[in-house]
Amino acid sequence: MYSNLKSIGVVNYDNIDKYTLRQEGDTDILKIYFRKASRQFLAKSLKFKFPRQRKKISQDHGSSGFRNVSEIGSTLRYVLKELDSLTEHVKEEKELKVQVLEDLKHLESVVASKIKEIERKLEQM
């Protein structure tokens, strides 16, 4: 029924609560959140990374050059379509400033944890 979700290992279709999608470099990161069971403290989630599809398109009508663009891959596009049908996901438009601040906070936490990891490795040397 949901062949694309099944192909990435998602089989608990009825327990999917929501999902998020973000881009980091040349990768799209999909995180699927499941409804938490009564005895769980935190809800379970799965994280998937998909490479972005690269294309060359012609620039403007007058120029003869091409430019590289990246877009969401076809596999991820089909997975999102199935997720939308499961969650009836209605994504509200966020203001650009709010979204940039959220991305910045996420980046800060990723960099901070990576720095701590490198410092621990240096201490062990």
UniProtKB/Swiss-Prot annotation:
Family to which this protein belongs: Belongs to the UPF0325 family.
InterPro entries, A to Z: UPF0325
HAMAP family: UPF0325
Organism field: Psychromonas ingrahamii (strain DSM 17664 / CCUG 51855 / 37)
One Pfam family here: DUF3461
Protein name: UPF0325 protein Ping_0715
